[in-house]
Curated annotation (Swiss-Prot):
NCBIfam families cross-referenced by the UniProt entry: LPXTG_anchor, MSCRAMM_ClfA, YSIRK_signal
UniProt-recorded name of the protein: Clumping factor A
Species name: Staphylococcus aureus (strain Mu50 / ATCC 700699)
Subcellular location: Secreted, Cell wall
Comp. bias intervals (Polar residues): 71-105, 163-205
SUPFAM superfamilies the record matches: Bacterial adhesins (SSF49401)
Its job: Cell surface-associated protein implicated in virulence. Promotes bacterial attachment exclusively to the gamma-chain of human fibrinogen. Induces formation of bacterial clumps.
Residue ranges annotated as motif YSIRK-G/S signaling motif: 9-20
Keyword presence, Secreted: yes
Membrane topology type: Peptidoglycan-anchor
Length: 935
């Protein structure tokens, strides 16, 4: 029993020993881990503490720290990334310089801590112990600098509004939430996004109800705190103060005012004495730069006095030992001053007052912030309101949809202004974006001063991406794919320290308007610097860019269009045209047209055509025609002719004709022609003609003709003719006759004739005739003729004729003819004609033609047409046929082929029918003569 107890006791003792070792080891590791965690969580504790001094120093730490890419939530990872950030500072000379500059810009009490952190980063590896040491010193400084709370709060304004880094495009909101859990210490990186506690600090710093504190004043006062001296402001003499500016100042167009001061220094002034220049609260001396500087007063290459800016924005100058050894010292100062957007938030008149002691100057100016840019329902404006050249950061504030219009699928993009050497870096690493919704557009300040606590932060509800190099995109939260309220976008970004360019940013707002048309509106921001002081404000100009392509989410509604294959058109045109053209064309055309035309034309044409034809003609015709015709023709022709003609004609004719014809003809002619034509014609004619003709003819013809004709004609004719003809004919006959005849005839004839003739005649005739005849004839004829003729003729005729005719004829004829003719004719004609025609034609033709024409015409046409078509419509403002009307004479002497219009060549048709009529007349004349000879 005792053995068992001992063994049990021994086992228990051993168990206790092992447990002690394990527990001790865990406690040791736990203590080490707690110290490490304490180092990384130290800033969180400071941020959440109730002490105002501690909160102030935390804010100052943010200002002094450089910016890195912390994205992690856990405290341990935060510490690790902090070390990495410090290591990168040591590796990157530019970033290292930034860290050192941040230390210089911090308050006097923070300088040793920041300097220590910088030394550690540069010279040795970063360890948790080093970080802890730095934070411990920071905690001690909190207790030592409780009196500096106001100054550090002022610096917080600069630090909270300094740019922070976002993580990646897809995780912006998550990163921003994470950033609120860890605020880096003084030697760590600045937070990626402003947390809730920092927002409170900003609200307190910029609250208009509290005394105004300026971010730039601390650095200047702390760095250049003057030694104890006497304020001799009221001892300065010969003080002169002026304000130079126009009557209107445009702050967003780099507008500013100049403050000028001049004075004499009393001989009693010594080193350390000071004087004060009061600056009105409506002005500041930094513009958009985060740190304001005032120019030192120089005496040659020696400094007479150095200036700093106090917390109220006034300037305090401290004399150097230069005044100890000088007398009758005078000085002049000129400083650029800028409209303060926090204290002047609206457009209006402002009275500016500045001075030295009791010597002041005042001036009332109009402050004009100008309206945002608007294009249709899109409105936007932006401004660059802060630049920190020490830390290479900037802040841009953009008003999106300040008009409060209805915009569908809104989006904002930001990028560099094209064709500029902008030094901005836009990417997920160097750009942080905050978005605020504005419920009432009246809450927007015209100066673009923004207090973030006054608006709803909707950054977590928007989609922020970086689709291209140096470009970001913000897609706004929408209700039914549209927005109706303004938004504020605050961009905190970085500047490339190696760039030689200036800041130049473009913001573009996209969206659909009420008509579902995709629109865009852009605004450009740049920075101007004055007097080398590093101060300035944005140069703003609205830009309406080239409208973008459709994004694809919403199809725009196409513009109304009506494409009716049937169209009605009415046109009234008056044109003068002169053309000289030569053409070689082959066309197959089928046309169906109905037209009513009224035209007056004067044409001058010279044509040379070869369809086996060579012609030279000059004609001058004046015609007025009104025609009404309906014809249905179907023709196929194959012709080969050889002709050499020289004609000059001048004709004046007036005709009124009404005809209806239905013809079907097929002809094949070859200088030997064999033609078969069937025609059914009905004509009624009433003609009155006076003719005086004188002709000399020498003809030799051989003809073999056989004709059968059955004709039926009704005619009423009245003619007066005076003819003089000389003819030389050889048909085995020689005749000379002079005749003067006056006849009145009324004839009614019915004839049915069938004739076959073969004739060969040579005739030489000389005749002169003067005839006056009145005839009224009515004839019905039915003729069938077959003729074979061979004729050689040489004729020269001059004719002057004027005729008025009204004819109506009905004819039914069938003829077969085989003719071979060679003709050489020279004719000159002068005709004046007037015609009234109304025609409707349906034609189907196949033609091969080679023509050359030269015509000059004046035409006035009035036409109404209705056509069924499916074609491209030429816009009303485009020139007819795609050419400019001013080029109507450019085609002169051109050898380009005429366009194929499908219309028949009326000149050629007239010439052909004229030749056929002449041939028929000749054959008829010869047959009658032969009949007379037989009798």
């Amino acid at each position: 029993m005792n053995m068992k107890k001992k063994e049990k006791h021994a086992i228990r003792k051993k168990s206790i020993g092992v447990a002690s070792v394990l527990v001790g080891t865990l406690i040791g590791f736990g203590l080490l881990s707690s110290k490490e965690a304490d180092a990384s969580e130290n800033s969180v504790t400071q941020s959440d503490s109730a002490s105002n001094e501690s909160k102030s120093n935390d804010s100052s730490s943010v200002s002094a720290a450089p910016k890195t890419d912390d994205t992690n939530v856990s405290d341990t990872k935060t510490s690790s990334n902090t070390n990495n950030g410090e290591t990168s500072v040591a590796q990157n000379p530019a970033q290292q310089e930034t860290t050192q500059s941040s230390s210089t810009n911090a308050t006097t009490e923070e300088t040793p801590v920041t300097g220590e952190a910088t030394t550690t980063t540069t010279n040795q590896a970063n360890t948790p112990a080093t970080t802890q040491s730095s934070n411990t010193n920071a905690e001690e400084l909190v207790n030592q600098t409780s009196n500096e709370t106001t100054s550090n709060d002022t610096n917080t304004v600069s630090s909270v509004n300094s740019p922070q880094n976002s993580t990646n495009a897809e995780n912006v909101s998550t990163t921003q939430d994470t950033s609120t859990e860890a605020t880096p210490s003084n030697n760590e990186s600045a937070p990626q996004n402003t947390d809730a506690s920092n927002k409170d600090v900003v609200s307190q710093a910029v609250n208009p109800s509290t005394p105004r504190m300026r971010a730039f004043s601390l650095a200047a006062v702390a760095a250049d705190a003057p030694a104890a001296g006497t304020d001799i402001t009221n001892q300065l003499t010969d003080v002169k103060v002026t304000i130079d500016s126009g009557t209107t100042v445009y702050p967003h167009q780099a507008g500013y005012v100049k403050l000028n001061y001049g004075f004499s220094v009393p001989n009693s002034a010594v080193k350390g004495d000071t004087f004060k220049i009061t600056v009105p609260k409506e002005l500041n001396l930094n513009g958009v730069t985060s740190t304001a500087k005032v120019p030192p007063i120089m005496a040659g290459d020696q400094v007479l006095a150095n200036g700093v800016i106090d917390s109220d924005g006034n300037v305090i100058y401290t004399f150097t030992d230069y005044v100890d050894n000088k007398e009758n010292v005078t000085a002049n100062i000129t400083m650029p001053a800028y409209i303060d957007p926090e204290n002047v938030t609206k457009t209006g008149n402002v009275t500016l007052t500045t001075g030295i002691g009791t010597n002041t100057a005042s001036k009332t100016v109009l402050i004009d912030y100008e309206k945002y840019g608007q294009f249709h329902n899109l409105s936007i404006k932006g401004t660059i309101d802060q630049i920190d050249k020490t830390n290479n950061t900037y802040r841009q504030t953009i008003y999106v949809n300040p008009s409060g219009d209805n915009v569908v699928l809104p989006a904002l993009t930001g990028n560099l202004i094209p064709n500029t050497k902008s030094n901005a870096l836009i990417d997920a690493k160097n750009t942080d974006i905050k978005v605020y919704r504005v419920d009432n557009a009246n809450d927007l300040s015209e100066s673009y001063y923004v207090n973030p606590s006054d608006f709803e932060d909707v950054t977590n509800q928007v989609r922020i991406s970086f689709p291209n190099a140096n470009q970001y995109k913000v897609e706004f939260p929408t209700d039914d794919d549209q927005i109706t309220t303004p938004y504020i976008v605050v961009v905190n970004g970085h500047i490339d320290p190696a760039s030689t360019g200036d800041l130049a940013l473009r913001s573009t707002f996209y969206g659909y308007d009420s008509n579902f048309i995709w629109r865009s509106m852009s605004w450009d921001n740049e920075v101007a610097f004055n007097n080398g002081s590093g101060s300035g404000d944005g140069i703003d100009k609205p830009v309406v860019p080239e409208q973008p392509d459709e994004p694809g989410e919403i199809e725009p509604i196409p513009e109304d269009s009506d494409s009716d294959p049937g169209s009605d058109s009415g046109s009234d045109s008056n044109s003068d045209s002169g053309s000289d053209s030569g053409s070689d064309s082959t066309s197959d055309s089928g046309s169906d047209s109905a037209s009513d035309s009224d035209s007056a034309s004067d044409s001058d044409s010279a044509s040379d055509s070869d369809s086996a034809s060579d012609s030279d003609s000059a004609s001058d015709s004046d015609s007025a025609s009104d025609s009404d015709s309906a014809s249905d023709s179907d023709s196929a022709s194959d012709s080969d002719s050889a002709s050499d003609s020289d004609s000059a004609s001048d004709s004046d004719s007036a005709s009124d004709s009404d005809s209806a014809s239905d013809s079907d003809s097929a002809s094949d002619s070859d200088s030997d022609s064999d033609s078969d034509s069937d025609s059914d014609s009905d004509s009624d004619s009433d003609s009155d003609s006076d003719s005086d003709s004188d002709s000399d003819s020498d003809s030799d013809s051989d003809s073999d003709s056989d004709s059968d004709s059955d004709s039926d004609s009704d005619s009423d004719s009245d003619s007066d003719s005076d003819s003089d003809s000389d003819s030389d004919s050889d048909s085995d006959s020689d005749s000379d006759s002079d005749s003067d005849s006056d006849s009145d005839s009324d004839s009614d004839s019915d004839s049915d004739s069938d004739s076959d003739s073969d004739s060969d005649s040579d005739s030489d005739s000389d005749s002169a005739s003067d005839s006056d005849s009145d005839s009224d004839s009515e004839s019905d004829s039915d003729s069938d003729s077959d003729s074979d003729s061979d004729s050689d003729s040489d004729s020269d005729s001059d004719s002057d004729s004027e005729s008025d005719s009204d004819s109506d004829s009905d004819s039914d004829s069938e003829s077969d003819s085989d003719s071979d003719s060679d003709s050489d004719s020279d004719s000159a004609s002068d005709s004046d004609s007037g015609s009234d025609s109304d025609s409707s034609s349906d034609s189907d033709s196949d033609s091969t033609s080679d023509t050359g024409s030269d015509n000059d015409s004046d035409s006035d046409s009035n036409s109404d047409s209705e056509s069924g078509s499916n074609n491209n419509v030429v816009p009303p403002n485009s020139p007819k046929n795609g050419t400019n009307a001013s080029n109507k004479n450019e085609a002169k002497d051109s050898k380009e082929p005429l366009p194929d219009t499908g219309s028949e060549d009326e000149a050629n048709t007239s010439l052909i029918w004229g030749l056929l009529a002449s041939l028929g007349s000749l054959l008829l004349f010869r047959r009658k003569k032969e009949n007379k000879d037989k009798k």
